[in-house]
UniProtKB/Swiss-Prot annotation:
Residues binding Mg(2+): 199, 213
Cofactor info, note text: Binds 1 Mg(2+) ion per subunit.
Entry keyword annotation includes ATP-binding: yes
InterPro entries, alphabetized: ATP-grasp_succ-CoA_synth-type, ATP_grasp_subdomain_1, Succ-CoA_synthase_bsu_CS, SUCC_ACL_C, Succ_CoA_ligase-like_bsu, Succinyl-CoA_synth-like
Pathway annotation: Carbohydrate metabolism; tricarboxylic acid cycle; succinate from succinyl-CoA (ligase route): step 1/1
Protein known as: Succinate--CoA ligase [ADP-forming] subunit beta
Catalytic activity: succinate + ATP + CoA = succinyl-CoA + ADP + phosphate; GTP + succinate + CoA = succinyl-CoA + GDP + phosphate
Organism: Anaplasma marginale (strain St. Maries)
Function field: Succinyl-CoA synthetase functions in the citric acid cycle (TCA), coupling the hydrolysis of succinyl-CoA to the synthesis of either ATP or GTP and thus represents the only step of substrate-level phosphorylation in the TCA. The beta subunit provides nucleotide specificity of the enzyme and binds the substrate succinate, while the binding sites for coenzyme A and phosphate are found in the alpha subunit.
Amino acid sequence: MNVHEFQAKGVLSSFGVTVPRGVVVESVEEVDRLLGDLAPGLVAVKAQIHAGGRGKAGGVKIGKTKDEVKSLVKQMLHSVLITHQTSPEGQKVNKVYLEEGVDIGKEYYISAVVDRSVGRVSIIFSSEGGVDIETVAKERPNMVSVVHVDPLYGFRSFHGQELCRRFGLGPKQVSGVVSMARKIYKVLVETDASQVEINPMAETSSGEFLALDAKIAFDDNGLYRNPEIAKLQDPDEYAAEELEAAKHGLSYIKMDGNIGCMVNGAGLAMATMDIIKYYGGEPANFLDVGGGANQEAVREAFKIILQSGVKGILVNIFGGIMRCDVIAKGIIESTKEIGVDVPLVVRLSGTNFEIGRKLLDDSGLGITAAADLDEAASFIVKMVNERR
């Protein structure tokens, strides 16, 4: 689960990270009332969306006067930002964060991330902040330092010392970086986050270290034990289909194609999307019904897929624990109830798959039962293209 910058800073602040004072506005009228809570001077006006690259897209501006701040808020609110991390349609701005200006002496980058490749928490630090860290790592790898923290022992001061070693920082700067690294590690572990990023981390002219921008991604599987974190979810930042899927325990991600996918298992779902593209089609979604899907889950999955206006649907089920005949019955009943009026191709493999295929063939609903995934993908792409 992603959160807005102002929410991420609220979490960081609760763990002792210094952040500039700021207020959130959802209308221009709120500016007059809330701007007084900030110190006089420059104000950073920041569009709040769940995507990076806001600055280059015009989503971060500096206001010098109240009138200028109000004008910037008016421009941003309800506008659509398109960045390298959004879809081509962009994301609508429903909130704007107003933040006190900071006297910046130096900018850095620091993050903590669950690194599955090493089975550790990786702390990443760079003396170049406020820029895309992937670009820095690619073009100037000597400017990025990484340490791996064993969760059995946790973060230690020597980890922080190692982060700073190559950058020639003074004792006070090293102390500031080590302190920040320790805090973000604690945030990551105690909130079940998968990533905590501060970019840039600013060193002020007085030597104080603070978070100028922040991003936190939380593991959805840990939200049950972090109810206060779960409350931070902003429904406006998610597609309606994604929210509906979550209610029914389905994993759904909306995409830009026109072929709906219903699959059991994340790996199989990704392989299904890949093979659709291989045959020249475009998947409309990632939808994992899970290993224990029943007829109700299949019915809800069909409803969600059809909300997107797809031109065809590919169902790819491997029956391990699940029985393919039960899934076939669910597909048939759902098709009758909902009225699926687009081409539907089903590939069943595993437990009772022969029975399942026969049920589909005998249903009289025009459902195409494919023998394997290659055949299924080629069938659905061809059918969709023929209907254009």
